[in-house]
């Protein structure tokens, strides 16, 4: 329905948002709300890193070591959902970044969540900036959606990780 009723420039904007687009910034009045929500959610996840390390041994073992497993799960699920919602509301859906970057960081830096969480966040930001730069320059002056670039790079890496895990 939308494709038949919207003007072509509106349709292009929707298509780019659906595939990821970093060409527009959030309105200034909304920016501080995004920053505060990001700081609270990211801070909440960072505070659970040690408990997440204990959860690697299993829920029962972590509970015996004093971890409130239900609380940690709730904090991580809610915080991750808020962070995902913030990112998608600003840039649209950019696939493969949240799936692949943490796996690559785990291969590079190990499984300690005190290291893995910040390196995954920084690695994801770097991956998105690189993908956006490629999307803007690869067929300049036309711009590709960022999600198209991450999919072209992410799909082969994902297949490699799947095959590596099976062997």
Identify what each model region corresponds to:
Residues 1-167:
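Alpha-helical transmembrane segments in inner-membrane proteins
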């Amino acid at each position: 329905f939308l494709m038949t009723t919207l003007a072509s420039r509106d349709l292009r904007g929707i298509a780019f948002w659906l595939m990821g687009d970093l060409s527009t910034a959030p309105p200034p009045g909304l920016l501080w709300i995004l920053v505060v929500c990001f700081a609270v959610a990211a801070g909440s996840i960072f505070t659970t890193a040690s408990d997440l390390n204990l959860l690697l041994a299993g829920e029962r073992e972590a509970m015996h070591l004093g971890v409130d497993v239900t609380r940690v799960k709730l904090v991580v699920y809610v915080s991750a959902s808020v962070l995902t919602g913030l990112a998608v509301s600003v840039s649209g859906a950019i696939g493969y970044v949240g799936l692949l970057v943490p796996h690559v960081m785990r291969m590079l830096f190990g499984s300690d969540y005190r290291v893995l969480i910040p390196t995954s966040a920084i690695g994801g930001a770097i991956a998105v900036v690189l993908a956006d730069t490629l999307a803007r320059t690869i067929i300049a002056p036309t711009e590709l959606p960022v999600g198209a670039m991450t999919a072209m790079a992410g799909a082969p890496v994902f297949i490699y990780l799947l095959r590596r895990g099976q062997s």
